[in-house]
Regions:
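Short amphipathic alpha-helical interface segments enriched in basic and hydrophobic/aromatic residues
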Residues: 17-18, 44
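Compact soluble domain cores
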Residues: 30-47, 51
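Enriched for short, Lys/Arg-rich terminal
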Residues: 1-6, 18-30, 51, 57-58, ...
Length: 95
């Protein structure tokens, strides 16, 4: 059983998901989102190590982490109790 109970998407991350879905082909969206799902599953196993080169973001309170989706985009998330909060899935954390 996974250590984490729930994945909670921020309104911004949901907006970004919709933007990606509406501006890319279905194949591109499927490939992009399958990478996000893979990263989330890896976060459930170990939130601070693993795929996507996890990096603690400096100066963020509460602490946030990022993982590489691709060369340009990062999955930014934070852990709160047993929940994974997805903050952003498009661009870098400081874009």
């Amino acid at each position: 059983m996974d250590k984490f109970l729930e994945v909670i998407w921020s309104p911004e991350a949901l907006r970004q998901k919709e933007l990606i879905e509406n501006t890319r082909s279905q194949d591109q969206f499927d490939m992009y989102f399958s990478k996000i799902i893979l990263l989330i599953e890896n976060i459930k196993q170990n939130p601070f190590k693993g795929l996507g080169k996890p990096e603690l973001l400096k100066y963020e309170i509460p602490p946030c982490w990022s993982r590489r989706i691709n060369k340009k985009d990062r999955l930014v998330y934070r852990i709160h109790k047993r929940d994974i909060h997805i903050i952003s899935i498009l661009g870098h954390y400081n874009d």
